[in-house]
A protein has these predicted regions:
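N-terminal maturation segment of proteins
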Residues: 1-249
Length: 249
């Protein structure tokens, strides 16, 4: 929670200084525009109650903590030592995340049940025997055999962090997580802008999506008829799955 508050203060402080920034080169105009857009969006999201308590199966804290290891260099022994060191810090990072989730829970802010369930499944896979961190430790040991024991200890430390998070999600959040996924038009528009970097006409986009989906379904029905006269799309899928010529072994 303290980290989120500090980030919000910094964002507001930076926002108040942006208007006084004078671009020198043309590229600075682009940078300044992007900075204003992202900071402005963040301030709106923060005001709307967005925060680390929200989770999903792709881009939320549980995945970001794990995926940071994918971005770390793997060229020298020092690189591998840094990876081990970071594995030892996973528990600390996730403990802070648990505090954020708990503070939000006390305010009635809990992610939808569907999202909590999938993150429970993902985190269990992270600390399972032979999971991500065990594989990472093995990768370290293969690159620098002398670091094998340290890597194994780091993996166990990281797994413990995810084990604790998983327990918290199961015991505290899952029982009170709302079953409703819908967030409402206002929140959806902010999420949309966050991912797209621009504002779109939601009604027009939705109508376009429905039209495209209907076109796809119509084409699927045509192909299903070609595969077997009178076949439904589901029947055509079954026939294709059962076709030895289309199976990978």
């Amino acid at each position: 929670p303290a980290g989120e508050k500090a980030f919000a203060r910094l964002a507001n402080k930076t926002w108040n200084k942006v208007d006084n920034v004078l671009p020198i080169y043309d590229v600075d105009l682009v940078t300044l525009d992007a900075l204003q857009e992202r900071l402005g969006l963040y301030r709106k999201q923060h005001k709307a109650g967005f925060g680390g308590w929200q989770m999903n199966n792709i881009a939320s804290v549980p995945q970001e903590v794990r995926s940071v290891f994918d971005l770390m260099k793997r060229n020298t022994q020092q690189d591998w030592e840094h990876i081990i060191g970071r594995m030892h810090r996973v528990t600390e990072a996730l403990e802070g995340y648990i505090q954020t989730l708990e503070a939000a829970r006390e305010e009635g802010k809990v992610a939808p049940r569907r999202q909590v369930d999938i993150v429970i499944e993902q985190t269990a896979a992270y600390y399972a025997p032979g999971g991500f961190f065990d594989e990472l430790a093995a990768e370290v040991a293969e690159a620098v055999p002398s670091l094998k024991d340290e890597a194994a200890a780091g993996a166990e430390a990281a797994k413990e962090g995810y084990r604790r998070l998983n327990s918290y999600l199961v015991e505290k959040l899952q029982p009170v997580a709302p079953s409703r996924d819908a967030v409402g038009r206002k929140a959806y528009s902010l999420h949309s802008r966050s991912f797209l970097g621009t504002t779109i006409d939601l009604d027009e986009t939705y109508a376009w999506g429905v039209t495209e989906l209907e076109s796809i379904i119509a084409r699927q029905s045509e192909v299903a008829e070609e595969i077997e006269p009178g076949a439904s799309i589901e029947r055509a899928q079954q026939l294709l799955d059962e076709d030895p010529a289309r199976q990978l072994h």
